[in-house]
Amino acid sequence: MATKKKTFEEAIAELETIVEALENGSASLEDSLDMYQKGIELTKLCQDKLQSAEQRMAKVVTEAGEEIPFEADGE
């Protein structure tokens, strides 16, 4: 069975659910560790998707002849 790749929005929604569950503090240590690990995986997925979108946008802007540098907040 093929697994469907998560969209950015699906990953963010799942990450928000995990954060709420961890903040609640009612999960066992083992469940909390599993959720934390899944959260790290989702964070990486979101970062990769954002980086890919940024590269696509930069390519489109460059092809249009209006190169605009991207600046990351807080860096």
From Swiss-Prot:
EC number of this enzyme: 3.1.11.6
GO annotation, biological process: DNA catabolic process
Pfam families in the cross-refs: Exonuc_VII_S
Subcellular location(s) per record: Cytoplasm
Broad class of enzyme this protein falls into: hydrolase
Domain of life: Bacteria
UniProt keyword Cytoplasm, yes or no: yes
InterPro entries: Exonuc_VII_S, Exonuc_VII_ssu_sf
Family statement drawn from the similarity comment of this UniProt entry: Belongs to the XseB family.
Function of the molecule: Bidirectionally degrades single-stranded DNA into large acid-insoluble oligonucleotides, which are then degraded further into small acid-soluble oligonucleotides.
Oligomeric form and interacting partners: Heterooligomer composed of large and small subunits.
Protein's UniProt name: Exodeoxyribonuclease 7 small subunit
